From Swiss-Prot:
The lineage of its organism: Bacteria, Pseudomonadati, Pseudomonadota, Gammaproteobacteria, Moraxellales. GO terms for molecular function: porin activity. This is Outer membrane protein Omp38. The gene is omp38. It is found in: Cell outer membrane; Host mitochondrion. GO terms for cellular component: cell outer membrane; host cell mitochondrion; pore complex. CDD domains: OmpA_C-like (cd07185).
Amino acid sequence: MKLSRIALATMLVAAPLAAANAGVTVTPLLLGYTFQDSQHNNGGKDGNLTNGPELQDDLFVGAALGIELTPWLGFEAEYNQVKGDVDGASAGAEYKQKQINGNFYVTSDLITKNYDSKIKPYVLLGAGHYKYDFDGVNRGTRGTSEEGTLGNAGVGAFWRLNDALSLRTEARATYNADEEFWNYTALAGLNVVLGGHLKPAAPVVEVAPVEPTPVAPQPQELTEDLNMELRVFFDTNKSNIKDQYKPEIAKVAEKLSEYPNATARIEGHTDNTGPRKLNERLSLARANSVKSALVNEYNVDASRLSTQGFAWDQPIADNKTKEGRAMNRRVFATITGSRTVVVQPGQEAAAPAAAQ
């Protein structure tokens, strides 16, 4: 009785825990027929039973709870019992055989790899503990019970009805090691799978990396700066522009057109000959001559041009020589500004305007 209580408690505790996982199997009822070994009936290795009383073959009843370890390998904890008559003893003599087993089974899927087949033959190997209780007949000098270790070997098949239910049939031989006798059982049951059968891992498919879609380069906005200088030289006491400098003034006008926000600072200078007042007016007149050329001939907005006369205050050469005085009679202009240009892919930005 104690053995059956342990087995029942183990299954009741394990069942709700196991049900949460795929591949858990429950066989709530195993029915079969056990054939008792004549060696046991005739006394076993120690002659514990007389040659007269015989254990009769009888109904096998059991239950099992298991788990699929792989798609082809499973393990089950099983409890079963056989209750039968003892012939040749006192009237009403009977025996009760109880077992608790741990069995591994391997299905044909190990070889065939046909995991969706409807019929799955299997082989079974396991071990456990058995106990016989006798009522109305003595077991020789050992009293009314015997127990020991057993080993199981069997063949069977799962007949799959659907993904959750299978009919199970099996032929099993049980070797009772302590008494050295065999029992043989033919059994059947309904096998229930909780959460679905285990499936083999899907093959890993290596997906080729997807090359990113090329993104067309976008146009870029760049800022171009303008830094330009102009030098115009004059004759003594003159403010008119010589023809040789007009192309240079035209270049300045062109850049002022290309850079709409550019401005020009125009400075007039003289040598040190003559009165200061005269040279102040002359230096400013020379600056205004360049400004007038830009405004009148090239339509440059006058507000973008500033002029100033410095007389002889900023010489760049020695006024004691003729050559030096010629260098000092000049206009010097600085033109500065910037513009934003859109550069297309593959196109180089224009180089900044060079100083003149």
